[in-house]
Amino acid sequence: MKTAIFTVVLALAVFAVLSFGWEANEKALSEESTELIHEKEAASETEARECRYFWGECHDHMPCCDWLVCRYKWPITYNICVWNRTFPEK
């Protein structure tokens, strides 16, 4: 009886140590993937951004293309790029 209880307690201790190791490995992997995502976002922010096309959402940091202008249009609750009644030069 004592041997069976000792075996069960020993098995539980081994499982606790193994699960702690797996959890630590999973946490490290999660932190690593988060760092990679942040690096990718930072790299994309430094690149030149394209202009916003017709009916695209626009702000000061998201300009419209040359032949469009950023305007507020009701009932849409944000600014959109609309045609400024000019044609782009070829």
Curated annotation (Swiss-Prot):
* Tissue specificity as recorded in UniProt: Expressed by the venom gland.
UniProtKB keywords: Disulfide bond, Ion channel impairing toxin, Knottin, Secreted, Signal, Toxin
Q: Where does the source fall among the domains of life?
A: Eukaryota
Propeptide stretch(es), residue numbers: 20-50
Alphabetical list of InterPro entries matching this protein: Huwentoxin-1
The cellular location(s) given in this protein's UniProt record come to:
Secreted
Q: What is its main location?
A: secreted
Q: Does the keyword Ribonucleoprotein apply?
A: no
Disulfide bridge positions per record: 51-65, 58-70, 64-81
MF terms in GO: ion channel inhibitor activity; toxin activity
- What family does the entry list? Belongs to the neurotoxin 10 (Hwtx-1) family. 13 (Hntx-13) subfamily.
Report the protein's function: Ion channel inhibitor.
State the name under which the record lists this protein: U7-theraphotoxin-Hhn1a 5
